[in-house]
Amino acid sequence: MTDVSSPAGGAASPVEMSTTSSSSAATTSASSSKPLTNGANKTAISTAAGGVTPGAVPGPGSGAIPASSSSGNQVKLEHHHRQSNNNRPAVTNRSSETKLMTPTGSSSSPSQSPSQTQASIQTQTSQQDRLAKASTTASQQDVDEVARLFEEKPEAFEKWLTERAPPEALSRLQEFIENRKPHKRPSVTSDLFQQWMAASPTVQQKSPRSLSNSSASSLPECRRHLMDLDEGELFMELIRDVANELDIDVLCHKILVNVGLLTHADRGSLFLAKGTPTNKYLVAKLFDVTQKTALKDAVTRASAEEIIIPFGIGIAGMVAQTKQMINIKEAYKDARFNCEIDLKTGYKTNAILCMPICNYEGDIIGVAQIINKTNGCMEFDEHDVEIFRRYLTFCGIGIQNAQLFEMSVQEYRRNQILLNLARSIFEEQNNLECLVTKIMTEARELLKCERCSVFLVDLDCCEASHLEKIIEKPNQPATRAIKSADSFEEKKMRNRFTVLFELGGEYQAANVSRPSVSELSSSTLAQIAQFVATTGQTVNICDVIEWVRDHNQIRAEDEIDSTQAILCMPIMNAQKKVIGVAQLINKANGVPFTDSDASIFEAFAIFCGLGIHNTQMYENACKLMAKQKVALECLSYHATASQDQTEKLTQDVIAEAESYNLYSFTFTDFELVDDDTCRAVLRMFMQCNLVSQFQIPYDVLCRWVLSVRKNYRPVKYHNWRHALNVAQTMFAMLKTGKMERFMTDLEILGLLVACLCHDLDHRGTNNAFQTKTESPLAILYTTSTMEHHHFDQCVMILNSEGNNIFQALSPEDYRSVMKTVESAILSTDLAMYFKKRNAFLELVENGEFDWQGEEKKDLLCGMMMTACDVSAIAKPWEVQHKVAKLVADEFFDQGDLEKLQLNTQPVAMMDRERKDELPKMQVGFIDVICLPLYRVLCDTFPWITPLYEGTLENRRNWQDLAEKVEMGLTWIDHDTIDKPVEEFAACADEEIKDIEFTVTTLNCNQQSQHGSEDSHTPEHQRSGSRLSMKKTGALGKAVRSKLSKTLYNSMDGSKPKTSLKLLESHVSEDMDDKSPTSPSQPQASGSMGRMSASSSTSSAGGQMVDKSKKRSKLCALL
């Protein structure tokens, strides 16, 4: 069945469009219509001019034929049209319709004379024949020629369209193209959403298929046309009419109009179910809609006067509650009927048919109600009931789809609003009032409420109440006591409101106030907000007076008389702490707030909390930045050297570089006092000609040096003297090592400054410790933590008043030297060294000799900084082992902190209990870091060979000491590791008294796999004057051979046997209880001997020592 107004047959041809536009009688017909059949033909003919009366059908002759004429006329008319369609081209079909009309487009008036009517018809017929002939001729003769031209020269056609085509032709061409496009089914797409957002659904242009969109005058014709269909075709046509409609307003209007057509009902109403599962009600979507009621009028009337019917009340309410149909034959005799509407409108209701609308799950989603029959019947019969039920079954599916689509549209709008709120949070970070006002405005408009309020909690009061109290109990340690449960009043005191934002009601614009305690306590709305802030629960109040009565803490006041519904929700921050309360008062339509409203309002509360928290964090950050500036000013003042110190250093005489031994790689600071260290630094700047080269004021340089020294902490190793040694090594590499030929003066200045500042404010702990303890420095700098801090301290000192030694530099030179300083300081991180080492080695292996490129220079400076930072390893042995002691003690202090604070076992180099392994670890440090670095630098720059040679010498010393530890000769059992064991040899020429040695004979045949345990005296049980030997029981052959050789070679050559005999005579066999025994071996094989040497024997042994070998082995004393 073809719809009356649908373009089902496709688009009309351009010739047809030309013909119809030339005739004023066809102005109301669509250009895309095609010939209709059966009943549709009659309707098309009767409505073509728009002026034919409903009771007449135009005939092929001169006048209108009465509707009461025999059906034979209709058959002849249809036959005439069929014959005309067969004999003429399709284009003349419109002309045949036009011939029946006057030139004005109306039917021939019966008052016209036959001659006038005949003349008019003949004139019109001749005009139409000429137009049709011209169109036919053009279509047959010219189309082929034009087509060939278009095919041969499409560029010319395109140029003609763009330059010379008339606007009317372009418009008709566009219309033709649009009409040729297939009709698309409406779908939930972004285009549909955009169309939905562009205009209100009730005023948008509706689909031409919609029967409910027809004008009031055309409805009788449409109805008559549909009534000529059989019942099945009519039913399917009306189902198709509502099947794809997604606008709930349009859908409800179509349903009521179509139901009126099906059941001959005079008018109808449609109610939709709303509310919560415990409080459901019906809302009149459209009310008293007739077949002539326009959609816009129906929607406007329903919006202006919203009718709400609770479930179980009235006829519609009973149908919704029971899900049963109600058919009332005489309304005024039914007690459930409310005649107030009839009294208002003057309409009398006789028969009522009310039926539920259910979804696929069987739940009530609406109620449809029709009133009074129009075909003369006084009641709705069973046939009407059945048609009504069948049609509403399909309508239930359509309503649910439309509601889902409406929900998706609402969600889309909600997301857009929330997106705007998210933008507002970033735009209004510094203005809390503007942010809250914007959020309240959006919430009030979206949820359609009368008033909106936001209460902010006094955070200072809340924080102060959570302070832990330290309570001393008798005979018990101090404990933290926090109440597990506070009373309601105590929680109220913590959540005290300080700021109130109000919008709506008497405040059309946002009002911000700071209510007093008395004002808050006398306001019911404030008390409700206080309750929500205290409990942290959302409150949705439908009856305020009853709710207030149930909560004794809330006192009812006069302000609640006008309050019908309240939705109150807590606002929380990221820590789930209540920072405010949002409150909505009264829906605009007088209904309670729904769960959907609460869900939407929750999103607003979350964004409000995020915005408030973000704004407060921003304010706190601004305050902290101000505090930081004050702290930096104080730090700068106290970190800067005093004027007296500066004047004194300025007036001091600076000795020559040779007197400080600055050119030597064996420089040591042990004999320099603190003032001399500063003078040595000044001398290095002078020798490099930096003071005059960069116009550094001498007093500024002195103050800067003193300030740098002042900002080093008194840790054991990474202190000011370490910085001095690093700077001196850099100076020696530049001068003695001739590295200055590869550097510019500006780079030399940057390197010396970097060396002096590379460990500023060092805390005696490394980067790993900062990360493990999550210190502020580790949070501030994620990589190279301490190195970044050292550079920042360097910048802070330079920015302090009177300390900027770069003040005379140009901006470009300043940026360059600061870049050099930063890169050099960061290069002292060994992690950076390992990253750069491979690239540097590759350049060296390729024979690189040009180091002037930026990347190459950066690599070279980085390697030089690392070489200077670890240069203590190349100092003379007397200096090296003392520095090693300082480094070890600092590491051990960090290990103690890790045990105490982190409860973790430190690594070996930081474990005080494993200090005997220090020589071995030093050898590993030299092999992994120092020797490879110095070797490659020495191969490339041979003038710095002393660093490599000093490192090799110290490695031999540490390796020798590591072997002694392996033999059981450990560090002297002092709390510190001041002296290595070989320094006892220096005392060989002195009389050794009262020193008791414990010598243990070792079972060299016994293997460690026997499960022997270390039986040497624990470290904490050793006396200060006792030397122990480890009883490993499994010394290697090489170690035993070396021990024996050292023993014999240390004796007097003339008395070797006597000395050995003397040694053996004092060895008594003794069984050690801790020595392991094996069942397969006699216990005597693991026997141990103990010897006590008296002072006289020790003296005699000491006299046999060659005095020229003061650093001989310990065994020489035996």
From Swiss-Prot:
Residues recorded as bearing Cysteine methyl ester in the entry: C1115
Domain named GAF: residues: 247-399, 431-612
Compositionally biased residues, Polar residues: 34-45, 84-101
Top-level taxon of the source organism: Eukaryota
Any one GO molecular function term: 3',5'-cyclic-GMP phosphodiesterase activity
Note on cofactor: Binds 2 divalent metal cations per subunit. Site 1 may preferentially bind zinc ions, while site 2 has a preference for magnesium and/or manganese ions.
Classification via CDD domains: HDc
Protein's recorded name: cGMP-specific 3',5'-cyclic phosphodiesterase
Organism of this sequence: Drosophila melanogaster (Fruit fly)
Gene name per UniProt: Pde6
